[in-house]
Amino acid sequence: MRILLTNDDGIHADGLAVLERIARTLSDDVWIVAPETDQSGLAHSLTLSEPLRLRQLGENRYALRGTPTDCVIMAIRKLLPGKPDLVLSGVNAGANLADDVTYSGTVAGAIEGTVHGVRSFALSQAYSYVAGHSIPWDVVETHAPALIAKLMRIDLPPGTFLNLNFPNCEPGEVAGVDVTSQGKLDFGLSVEERTDGRGLPYFWLRFGDRKGNFRPGTDIGTLRDNRISVTPLKLDLTDYAVQDIIAAALNSEVGS
């Protein structure tokens, strides 16, 4: 089985090293194509206004000056000797839950793999943002190999990929695995204005207190219960339930 690894935290990220160890428990044909620099929050973006610079760092290991989407495209269309059987994106430092998935470069790596018809999983490890708290990488490293092996035996529909989130706890405290839906999260974003040395303003986006929907069955609620969240997502964003409502309203307007 050929496995392609990518991420959005960059080629030297701890989470990518963890993901490589996970992948090598499943296969000896592992390829890594990851961004040269941190690409967090760039979602499913392409680099179209400047060239893509590629560096080989070792056997089947490459750093690309581009986004996670660029990395998957470069790997599948240029570098690999054949299409991979699995794309793993991550392991992200921090959970990708609820509305996070629309911003996440980690999730975008799985999206692009799915665009190319390859089974794809995004992996993220939750942790406490309180100063002094480390990221419990041993949780995902302990539990992901068996979980991925089980998920590989499932025949997913075309256009579907999986978003895996691992809880912030000790490996032995993980209470199980839930198949979840996306929750709802308010990031509490604000815009902070500062002044540079020339007296000109510049701005930072800042996260405040996050408020969300923690009900059972959602990705957020599941992680709070120290359970692994597996959320099936799909490329098709069409809201089929609303199609007929809109069509009926438009037809009514035309006839009036």
Swiss-Prot record:
Q: How is the cofactor bound?
A: Binds 1 divalent metal cation per subunit.
Catalysed reaction, written as an equation:
a ribonucleoside 5'-phosphate + H2O = a ribonucleoside + phosphate
Entry-linked Gene3D superfamilies:
Survival protein SurE-like phosphatase/nucleotidase (3.40.1210.10)
EC id: 3.1.3.5
Per UniProt, subcellular location reads as: Cytoplasm
Residues given in the record as a divalent metal cation binding sites: 8-9, 40, 92
Q: May I have one GO cellular component term?
A: cytoplasm
Keyword vocabulary terms for this entry: Cytoplasm, Hydrolase, Metal-binding, Nucleotide-binding
Q: Kind of enzyme, top EC level?
A: hydrolase
Tell me the SUPFAM superfamilies matching this sequence. SurE-like
Cofactor section: a divalent metal cation
**Superkingdom, taxonomy of origin:** Bacteria
Q: Name one GO molecular function term.
A: metal ion binding
Family under the similarity heading: Belongs to the SurE nucleotidase family.
> Which NCBIfam families has this protein been placed in?
PRK00346.1-4, surE
What role does this protein play? Nucleotidase that shows phosphatase activity on nucleoside 5'-monophosphates.
Name the record gives this protein:
5'-nucleotidase SurE
Native species = Allorhizobium ampelinum (strain ATCC BAA-846 / DSM 112012 / S4) (Agrobacterium vitis (strain S4))
Designated gene of the protein? surE
